[in-house]
Amino acid sequence: QNSTDRRNYGVRTVDGKEVPEQSDLATIPYIQVQQCRGDHLTYDNSTPYIYSATAYAAHSADILRRTAYILGKTDDEKRYTELFENIKRAFNDAWVNDDGSVSYYGEVSSQTAHCGESVALDGSVTRYTYYAENTPHCPSQTAYALAVDFDLIPKDKLKNTRKYFKNSILRNNGKLTVGFLGISHLAPALSKVGLDDVAFKLLEQEDNPSWLYSVKNGATTIWERWNSYIAETGTFGDVSMNSFNHYSYGAIGQWFFTDILGIRPVEFGYKSFMLSPKFGGGLTYAKGSFTSPYGKISSAWKLHDGKFTYDCTVPTNTTATLKLPNGDIH
């Protein structure tokens, strides 16, 4: 970013007015109610804007907190830590239950029942249905992915949340329902709570909606929609907005680097970093690299006849800690 770009940290936080604690329309402190695209192009359309917007508000405050820490801005760090905790508390009060599950009202689709409505100032009516565990319309994969990956679930509830999160995948037969907001957080959140096996199952799914469905049907680029083309019926998604080269769902690539290859920074700029490769599902080989400020970091592994072989590149003037899948640390 150049020095005149108003999106840089310094300008955004000079007077505190650029990063609001809540929408002007909010009736509950720290809950975000502004209209937005939400989990765009999701398959189940069940994650309310207010839920995802509040989760992302907390995440934004957390990013600012960490940025302030790196820059040595202690007053800002304190301010954004407090803001994060306040939004987290409001998020939990609104949507996280005592048993670690989440529940909320979501927009009604053609598949859900009408159980409530709200009327806007212009007279338009939005119908809602209640989404909770053990009901026909359970909370979405995105709902759990955001809550877990943004550290919004209290630690004493996380074990139970893990169970409900896993169920959000299994009840859809190991297929995806996430849209643009949930896609980059789904696999990392699953790994965060020890559900790597579920993440690999999603990765290898070939039925629609999945990453490999498009590959199986000849795709060489990432589609905008999970159903940009349905081979079984020979039909296309909404042609008014249906790109066959739209990388949003390719956000799973981050998890390839951080978890399958296992490259994670410990110190800023990868002065020190972790190498903690993972294997799972039917995957027997992985290799990748990127150029850090100190030089090329690479990680490669393969499985053959039950033997795990690993190779890596560590740049000069950096330190890496290697954690192998069997738990050995070097």
Where are the regions that the model predicts?
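Hydrophobic core segments within long, regular secondary-structure runs in both alpha-
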Residues: Q1, A58, R65, K78-N92, ...
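Aromatic- and histidine-enriched alpha-helix N-cap/loop-to-helix transition segments
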Residues: P48-H59, C138-T142, V178-L181, Y247, ...
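Extracellular polysaccharide-recognition and catalytic grooves
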Residues: N97-D98, S109, T135-G234, D238-M241
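Active-site acid/base region of carbohydrate-active enzymes
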Residues: Q1-S52, I70-S110, H114-Y144, D156, ...
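Well-ordered alpha-helical scaffold segments within catalytic/enzyme domains
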Residues: Q1, Y56-T74, A143-D156, H185-G194, ...
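Non-catalytic C-terminal accessory modules of carbohydrate-active enzymes
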Residues: D197-H330
